[in-house]
């Protein structure tokens, strides 16, 4: 499913019209992950609205790290003050191919570093990222911390004031069928929980210096842990 602001607006309208509500805040620890999103039509609409909200936040900000920092805090996915850290994945090297080198505007002999990480908020993995970057376009200090610590890429290069060019953004899963907003039919209510697959969103992007020079190409896959908090509890007033 391709991200659509008009679809997002319809989601919000549908959710508001479904019930006039007050929301009781909970933390992710109040319910197990298998109980947090019931398999009801309203819960499916809410889940899609939340997922599209994250999608919009990621697409409108240069740093996925900082966006996930805020998401983690706002949805209480980890203890207060927690920040995103990068857990290195070893043994899955992907040398830069011709397409990556073209995106980064480098020739066949220019060194490119590949970094494969899982971005964690507390004990929850929120995304998995493939990152190809040109070390010559970073400072020596940035290269050092990227090579020796669990710092996320976005935090390590933050002082570059970089920009982000989004190439593609895909919803890998939708709790509602395609065309649901043009039909009165929604999935029937289920007594079981809503169980999303492991990955929900995929973004491809290029990060650029202030002068427009590309220095990093990324493929980011966002996990179902981004929804690992209780669905809103809705009470008629």
Swiss-Prot record:
Q: Which of UniProt's keywords are assigned here?
A: Plasmid, Signal
Question: Source organism's superkingdom?
Answer: Bacteria
InterPro entries reported in the protein's UniProt record: Chorismate_lyase_/UTRA_dom_sf
**What range does the record give for the signal peptide?**
1-28
Q: Is Signal among the key words of this record?
A: yes
The protein depicted here goes by the name: Uncharacterized protein y4mC
